Amino acid sequence: MKLNYFQGALYPWRFCVIVGLLLAMVGAIVWRIVDLHVIDHDFLKGQGDARSVRHIAIPAHRGLITDRNGEPLAVSTPVTTLWANPKELMTAKERWPQLAAALGQDTKLFADRIEQNAEREFIYLVRGLTPEQGEGVIALKVPGVYSIEEFRRFYPAGEVVAHAVGFTDVDDRGREGIELAFDEWLAGVPGKRQVLKDRRGRVIKDVQVTKNAKPGKTLALSIDLRLQYLAHRELRNALLENGAKAGSLVIMDVKTGEILAMTNQPTYNPNNRRNLQPAAMRNRAMIDVFEPGSTVKPFSMSAALASGRWKPSDIVDVYPGTLQIGRYTIRDVSRNSRQLDLTGILIKSSNVGISKIAFDIGAESIYSVMQQVGLGQDTGLGFPGERVGNLPNHRKWPKAETATLAYGYGLSVTAIQLAHAYAALANDGKSVPLSMTRVDRVPDGVQVISPEVASTVQGMLQQVVEAQGGVFRAQVPGYHAAGKSGTARKVSVGTKGYRENAYRSLFAGFAPATDPRIAMVVVIDEPSKAGYFGGLVSAPVFSKVMAGALRLMNVPPDNLPTATEQQQVNAAPAKGGRG
């Protein structure tokens, strides 16, 4: 009987414990459900989203680069970049041949690359595809292959304006030319968008744009694409005709300081830089320095006139065409002259005559004029790789160095500097800052040569081109032109002295001479066919480009020849054009 009593009392107790435990467990589960779905809902949702919500950059295109008239020189086009997660791609090896073929890649090289990066989660497959090409690859639905939208630079004018505009790298950053110099201005600011991604990294939902992309700013250059094409064509033809190694041509607006054209040969296509040679990338107009030779004689003459000791009608005895200075002999190319006035010294390009004037006025005054017009000085353009050159300044000037300075040896300049100096002379002695961007208001200039002296030298240089025995090949049909040729021996690299039979042929001038609008410098490096004098090689290029440029700019002719005069010009014997 006792056993039955205890058994009857024990079973209800056990039942209550079990039921209580079950109720507690159910209560705990219900509480947890309430906790997850009500109390901690926002926190847990945020934690879940944090594991699937990502911020993706919205690419911003670079600013448009145009010429002065709005013609596009550099534009950004949308492209597709394909990337892969090698860890995922390793699970689909059977698809690799198909993917490699779609990418235009060798299957074995593709497989080797994926296997070498098997532990990584990101590698580029190919960049810069057209959107259509990218969509075609993505449509294959190969696991681990994804796309990114980017922008790539395209240069409509190609090689014609390559050295001025430059180019960007694969990440759309400026690397040469204007693209580098104005990179901060042109570069856009990427935006951000919030997206949901699945476990494979694929975007399954766009949530919101958190930051709008800000495109780069438009930049209008001073370049006139019409003049640039003209200069490019004629310079290229000149190199072919003369068997030359390289060349440069610069056109400047004398009033505003704008560089209207700047071209070099050889050049390159910025849209296709495969197998690009370093020599083709040289912006020679700004990087190559050279002795300017006789092209600086007008500035030596300016110093003489400014000194008050000389006037245009003064006579200098240049016979017999040589002048001995110690062990150094100064020689004229033409030695059939006896006495020359100052204009005659420029027409005949007499080294003896300009040296005698330099001895009288002193090298310091010549140095001062050359410095003020910008020879061997920083141009202020801030162009990548631009060189300054050298204008020596001796504490005491020996006679030989005084003479060589006067006729353009012993100093080094760039084509841009020489064009700037001639622009100042053409602008009545007023130098205005150089600009590679369009100038909408004529800047203030600095009077570096008096207007009276500048006007006199302008007239002399007009005679250099138009007088009998002058550089007739520089004459511009329909316009009065002014300028000076030069022929400079090339310095030997690594040894003292000059190279044998290696010259730079130069011509610098401006037009119309009666009211100058543009200045131009032509440099032909190492011509090897018909000759090497600047008046023979570079002057014809000046004539053709200047004539075309003035007409394109709608500058009215100021020297239309009569029919008889035109026949005389065509029948003129091939002489003159000394450097």
UniProtKB/Swiss-Prot annotation:
Region (Disordered): 558-579
Compartment(s) where it occurs, according to its Swiss-Prot or TrEMBL record: Cell inner membrane
Topology of the protein relative to the lipid bilayer: Single-pass membrane protein
Domain of life: Bacteria
Any one GO biological process: proteolysis
The gene coding this protein: ftsI
Keywords from the UniProt entry: Carboxypeptidase, Cell cycle, Cell division, Cell inner membrane, Cell membrane, Cell shape, Cell wall biogenesis/degradation, Hydrolase, Membrane, Peptidoglycan synthesis, Protease, Septation, Transmembrane, Transmembrane helix
Organism encoding this protein: Pseudomonas aeruginosa (strain ATCC 15692 / DSM 22644 / CIP 104116 / JCM 14847 / LMG 12228 / 1C / PRS 101 / PAO1)
GO molecular function annotation: penicillin binding; peptidoglycan glycosyltransferase activity; serine-type D-Ala-D-Ala carboxypeptidase activity
Induction / repression: Mainly produced during exponential phase of growth.
One Pfam family hit: Transpeptidase
Catalytic reactions of this protein: Preferential cleavage: (Ac)2-L-Lys-D-Ala-|-D-Ala. Also transpeptidation of peptidyl-alanyl moieties that are N-acyl substituents of D-alanine
Chain intervals with Polar residues compositional bias: 561-570
Family: Belongs to the transpeptidase family. FtsI subfamily.
Spans through the membrane: 15-35
Disulfide bonds: none
The protein's name in its UniProt record: Peptidoglycan D,D-transpeptidase FtsI
